[in-house]
């Protein structure tokens, strides 16, 4: 079996290595030719995943067409806001019969579309039954070291979800299946926004009570939005929801939590992002989800607060005061 992995960041590289370790022929595509040449020469990704050697069955490509042409399965691991422009470059390739597995977590800013919707629009011939999302609490730094990890492969097609499960499952990378791709994609997107809020709380110096409140009420926002779009509320209690939410809000590896923490300490968003080595998906997703929540009439006060702090310059302390002094309500999910 041939598998193409599009995106040579930490997560794309990790999955490429995982699949190659299983013996699959893996084509890893890097966006920048000079970076691809470096990966091919050094046989590891020293920029994002230093010390993890590439198996012999992993090849690095600069050409999207060459990477994808022989592939039975295509894994999209580029940033969510770059997904459409990336896959549109291969729209002339026949996609029937291929499984597309997206691992990018976000909502497209300009359209409010989920990642599976973007793939369906950008790739003629692709059907939703051939698209899957692989989400869950899975930091690349741990997966690459073969530390125990559990994720969920979600597709409206049971057959596709099972196929993805079979391909990715290892003794240390346990894959469950799920058919609620709407709930999974919304959960995977919203959790990054809530992680920014959790980081802001850390940066200010608040304690465990505040963090627990953010995670719990953030889960409520995640559930409300998922349900409004046709998702199953049970999904947010699984790996793509509470599982990924907890790890992203608490882990030292979390880019989104780091962005929030630095903002809580007084740094500007532009300054934080300019000095980061990797993409924090929650930044643009906060605007996309805020816009989507307004369109759907879904109350998401934490998401709104993050959006206002990041994009409208609202002072952190004022945003927190506004959150805490809202009209008292029932605890309704």
Swiss-Prot record:
EC number: 1.1.1.94
Record-given protein name: Glycerol-3-phosphate dehydrogenase [NAD(P)+]
Species for this entry: Chlorobium limicola (strain DSM 245 / NBRC 103803 / 6330)
Sites where the protein binds sn-glycerol 3-phosphate: 105, 136, 138, 191, 244, 254-256
Gene Ontology molecular-function annotations: glycerol-3-phosphate dehydrogenase [NAD(P)+] activity; NAD binding
Keywords on record: Cytoplasm, Lipid biosynthesis, Lipid metabolism, NAD, NADP, Nucleotide-binding, Oxidoreductase, Phospholipid biosynthesis, Phospholipid metabolism
Active site per database record: 191 (proton acceptor)
InterPro entries in alphabetical order: 6-PGluconate_DH-like_C_sf, 6PGD_dom2, G3P_DH_NAD-dep, G3P_DH_NAD-dep_C, G3P_DH_NAD-dep_N, NAD(P)-bd_dom_sf
Gene Ontology CC: cytosol
Catalytic reaction equation(s): sn-glycerol 3-phosphate + NAD(+) = dihydroxyacetone phosphate + NADH + H(+); sn-glycerol 3-phosphate + NADP(+) = dihydroxyacetone phosphate + NADPH + H(+)
Gene3D superfamilies: N-(1-d-carboxylethyl)-l-norvaline Dehydrogenase, domain 2, NAD(P)-binding Rossmann-like Domain
Compartment(s) of residence: Cytoplasm
Binding sites annotated in the UniProt record for NADPH: 10-11, 31-32, 105, 140, 255, 279, 281
Described purpose of this protein according to its UniProt entry: Catalyzes the reduction of the glycolytic intermediate dihydroxyacetone phosphate (DHAP) to sn-glycerol 3-phosphate (G3P), the key precursor for phospholipid synthesis.
